[in-house]
Amino acid sequence: MQTFSRFRFPHAVLTSCAAVLLSLGGASPAAAAPSAGDTFPQDRQDLLKNKKYQQGLKALENRLPLEASKHFQECLSSQNLAESQKAIIRPFLAEALIRAKKTEEGLNAWEQLPDSPMKSYWTAVGLFNKGSFTKALEKLTAIPETDPLSLYGLQLKAQLARQLQDRQLLLETLSRLGQAE
């Protein structure tokens, strides 16, 4: 059985695809997806005044997911937040948990949230972290191609194809990544 390391081009193709994604701004999938604040503009504005929420966002931006999850958890335990504000915080907490490799906690947090492309993506990342590659691949199919998260989904799909040693899926995914701009 051939492994991907014996192919002549996939490493170069993966590298070029990563460069394309980074050239798109290097933003995290959370930044690419429409925020919950689009649904609750006033709540989002009020929430931006919350120190723990600000610290959580800053920690995520600085790639400190464990610290971010702590800030978001403290923010959620606050008595003076409206339920609509807590609904804005929960996806950030779930993302931070997955990023911090607290996979089970993160998957449980996402399970409590309504279906969305962001939920599908982060659930797939969590399943990938657990080594459940086939289940992760299934979750990615729920992300529409028109959604900004689809680029991140394709990147993850390429990694999954590599782990599954599915050359055809890898080639298809890399081809779609090359066409996406």
Question: What do these predicted ranges mean?
Answer:
Residues 75-76, 113-114, 143, 177:
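Alpha-helical solenoid scaffolds that mediate protein-protein interactions
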